[in-house]
Amino acid sequence: MQRSEIVQAVTLLVVVFAITTAECTCPGNLDWQEYDGHCYWASTYQVRWNDAQLACQTVHPGAYLATIQSQLENAFISETVSNNRLWIGLNDIDLEGHYVWSNGEATDFTYWSSNNPNNWENQDCGVVNYDTVTGQWDDDDCNKNKNFLCKMPIIGCPPCGI
């Protein structure tokens, strides 16, 4: 083996080692909570839904209004978050009755409370409603000020989760 091949092999080993031993963490700037490869942060202040989207991006690059993709994730958030009505990324702003996540993720899971979404007085934005035991969701007027929930992938880990 020539010297250049040895250097290449050692470099490759160092890179693989660095990737596999990378510390996967949530940002340290706020009280982020970790669950299933993602970090969650509940705001301590209230804003309108559109401003909440911008606030998540400001709090940490790559953060967005939370998506909730399973009953287990919803239960984690319900147990972790102390605020009781939080904006999430779910909305039907573009097409009434067709709820989508603001970050483009598929809307495969929903957990609406009974008779919701109801679009009462033009309610187009999703709220997690943790003041009930069930943690079900509601739709509300996007122009109301509410606390909000940000979500982002854990940082420091390769996408494949090695």
Swiss-Prot record:
Disulfide bond sites: C26-C39, C56-C150, C125-C142
Annotated InterPro entries: C-type_lectin-like, C-type_lectin-like/link_sf, C-type_lectin/snaclec_domain, C-type_lectin_CS, CTDL_fold
Gene Ontology molecular functions: carbohydrate binding
Tissue expression pattern: Coelemic fluid.
Residues of the signal peptide: 1-24
Keywords associated with the record: Calcium, Disulfide bond, Lectin, Signal
Pfam families in UniProt: Lectin_C
Domain C-type lectin: 25-152
Note: This lectin binds galactose.
Function: Sugar-binding protein which recognizes specific carbohydrate structures and agglutinates a variety of animal cells by binding to cell-surface glycoproteins and glycolipids. Calcium-dependent lectin. Invertebrate lectins may be involved in defense functions.
Subunit structure: Homotetramer; disulfide-linked.
PANTHER family assigned: MANNOSE, PHOSPHOLIPASE, LECTIN RECEPTOR RELATED (PTHR22803)
Name the UniProt record assigns to this protein: Lectin BRA-3
Native source species: Megabalanus rosa
Classification of source organism: Eukaryota, Metazoa, Ecdysozoa, Arthropoda, Crustacea
